[in-house]
Each structure stands twice: as C-alpha cells, then as structure tokens.
Amino acid sequence: MSGFSSEERAAPFTLEYRVFLKNEKGQYISPFHDIPIYADKEVFHMVVEVPRWSNAKMEIATKDPLNPIKQDVKKGKLRYVANLFPYKGYIWNYGAIPQTWEDPGHNDKHTGCCGDNDPIDVCEIGSKVCARGEIIRVKVLGILAMIDEGETDWKVIAINVEDPDAANYNDINDVKRLKPGYLEATVDWFRRYKVPDGKPENEFAFNAEFKDKNFAIDIIESTHDYWRALVTKKTDGKGISCMNTTVSESPFQCDPDAAKAIVDALPPPCESACTIPTDVDKWFHHQKN
C-alpha cells in the first residue's frame, strides 16, 4: 500500500471534474510536487492518470493549485483519444512520475527539442488495470524519445512492483522477450494516435528505438533536477502552480489548512458519472506510412 488516497470532486467526464490526492494523514497534497519521486531504491512512484483501455485524456493539471487530475480540454470540449485500429483507448496504464518536469526552456541534446512543460510520462505494462488517481510503485525498464509537435516528450516504460511477473522484468530487453509485439505497438500507438484528430504523425529520436533502464533513469533524474529548480523558484514556471505542502526549501509551500481551503471551495463529489459520448467508441482505420 502506498499510503496515498484520492478524492473526486464533481462528476467524471465533465469540465468541473477533479481528482485530488491525499497523504496518509488525509491531508490534501499535490501529486506533482508532494509525492516523492522515489518509493525505494530504484523504485519510482507513478501517478496513474489514465487506466488501460480507457479513452478519457486525464492529466495532472499543472497550472491549477494542488495540481489535481482533470480531463484535458481542447476548444471547449473534453478530450478523448481515438480508438485507432487495432487498439482500444490507451494500451497501458498511463501516468506520470511525480517531482519531475520536462523544462520547456531546456533544449534536449538527444532530441534537439525543448521539453513539453509536463511531468515525465510513464506507460505501465503490468497485468492490473489501475484506477485513476492511484499511486503505484514501479520498476523502470526503458524509455522512448517521442517528439510531439516539436517538443520533447519522453515515454518511460515501467512495471508495477506488485505485478506477479515483476521479478522477471529488469530491463527493456525483458519486455521484448516476454511481451513480443508490445513495444512495437507502443511506438505505433504514439506515432499515430493524433491522426484521427487531423494532426500529423509524431516523430521519434533514435529511430524510434527504446533505450535501456540506465539511460531511462538518467533522463528521469535530469527531469527531477529541472523540477527542483522549478519548485525552488530558480526557474520561471510561467503559470505552473508550484503550491505544495512538503517541499521545505520551496517558497510555494503552504500549510494543510490552505490546501484544504482550495478543495473545499469546489463542487462536492458526485455519485454518478456523466455519459461518455457514443462516438468515443468509434474505430478509426488509418494506413500506416
């Protein structure tokens, strides 16, 4: 058990919906800033934003106080990823590693592009379908260097340490051996998932090859350094909310009562979710280039 819990506000699949995180004392925290990057030696925390097979594009709201999880919005409409044949929604549990930040002011030497201004993304490949807002502990196995509309957008490949097969996975080659086709599907998914929305295919550094565990950890630790500069005001976040309750060296630290006041001002939890539009289930067929 991680000791963290989540609390929903308003109804899922609405513009007002939020998922706030709490610590073991039941106090509200930021999943971006207050959950430690490391859970143990070489074990990272992961904030689950999108459960496997689902379509609603949920993400940590980097500009909102306490950074709750909310559904992404484009042109006033809630975003859902398309089902690009043969896939259904996201093909892994998708989320982020806390206390990391891909700095948009830093030009990555591997990709030649600046960061995407978000925590680093994680694709968790275990057998369990996780819950939105769940905090899990993961082993990092490798990383993919995606370039999304000119921005560096690293994709970490990891597995839940609680997975029954976790002991068999220690590096990216284990994924190739034990889950044949999964990494190829991952590249294909990321390359084409925006095409149904009229966007071009995404590009990749390293000819779309996955780098190994050690390379991945180096990248994650560099994004942790960028995060620390952000939260200690050594870097201008330009609109990012760095409000936190635990980072003692941060000028943005607040007390638990101030955090509670943020949540108390929002709509209460809702018993039922709104209906997902039926066209979200549509299957798109697109010729691979």
Curated annotation (Swiss-Prot):
Tissue/organ expression: Highest levels are found in retinal rod outer segments.
UniProt GO cellular component terms: cytoplasm
Enzyme Commission (EC) number: 3.6.1.1
Positions bearing Phosphoserine: 250
Alphabetically ordered keywords of this record: Acetylation, Cytoplasm, Hydrolase, Magnesium, Metal-binding, Phosphoprotein
CC cofactor: Mg(2+)
Modification comment: The N-terminus is blocked.
UniProt-listed Gene3D superfamilies: Inorganic pyrophosphatase
One family name in Pfam for this protein: Pyrophosphatase
Reactions this protein catalyses: diphosphate + H2O = 2 phosphate + H(+)
InterPro entries, A to Z: Pyrophosphatase (IPR008162), Pyrophosphatase_sf (IPR036649)
One example GO MF annotation: magnesium ion binding
Positions contributing to Mg(2+) 2 binding: 121
Annotated positions of the N6-acetyllysine modification: 57
Main location: cytoplasm
PANTHER family: INORGANIC PYROPHOSPHATASE
Name recorded for this polypeptide: Inorganic pyrophosphatase
